[in-house]
Swiss-Prot record:
Recorded GO CC terms: cytoplasm
Any Pfam family the entry gives: Pribosyltran
Family affiliation: Belongs to the purine/pyrimidine phosphoribosyltransferase family.
Protein localization: Cytoplasm
A biological process term (GO) from this entry: adenine salvage
Subunit structure: Homodimer.
Catalytic activity: AMP + diphosphate = 5-phospho-alpha-D-ribose 1-diphosphate + adenine
Name of the protein this chain belongs to: Adenine phosphoribosyltransferase
Length: 181
């Protein structure tokens, strides 16, 4: 990975103190999206890293995972599968509940979106506690998909998500890390 590109990416991410609650330093990836150079650098790095992995599907988690997963799928020439909150997907779904850094939620995946022939990469904007991706991986594996890789733009290592996901036999790629919550 190009250190100059990684620096551009990290510098483009704004930190918002006390959002969504006091004591949290929110890492705002939307500021990266507003910066064409940073967004392109992000996508270029992900494409270069994953172009020869043989994935058949990219799964993105609601909602900011879509912003990186869908363009990556397009560039890799594979399908994109959204994982959504309850009631947002129109076909038959399976669901998985999970804990996140600010509470509890549920994710859903179409039952016909992944099968035993799929080799899947999971993409999200941020790795914090790992709960969202753990639930996403469980959904994919329930449908028979193989998932061994997850990619993130941002990681907050102090929250332990990387360790949690590595215990699920996932190989992680993170473009930049920030201290704290």
């Amino acid at each position: 990975m190009n250190n100059d590109s990684l620096a551009i990416i990290k510098q483009s991410i704004k930190t918002i103190p006390d959002y969504p609650k006091p004591g949290i330093l929110f890492r705002d990836v939307t500021s990266l999206l507003e910066d064409h150079t940073a967004y392109k650098a992000t996508m270029d790095i992900l494409v270069q890293h994953y172009k020869d992995h043989g994935f058949t599907k990219i799964v993105g988690t609601e909602a900011r995972g879509f912003l990186f997963g869908a363009p990556l799928a397009l560039e890799l020439g594979v399908g994109f599968v959204p994982v959504r909150k309850p009631g947002k997907l129109p076909r038959e779904t399976i669901s998985e509940s999970y804990e996140l850094e600010y509470g509890h939620d549920v994710l859903e995946l179409h039952t016909d979106a992944i099968n035993e022939n799929d080799k899947v990469l999971v993409v999200d904007d941020l790795l914090a506690t790992g709960g969202t991706i753990e639930a996403t991986v469980k959904l994919i594996r329930k449908l028979g998909g193989e998932v061994k890789h997850a990619a993130f733009v941002i990681s907050l290592p102090d929250l332990g998500g990387a360790k949690r996901l590595e215990e699920m036999d996932l190989e992680l790629v993170t473009l930049c890390e920030f201290e704290g919550e």
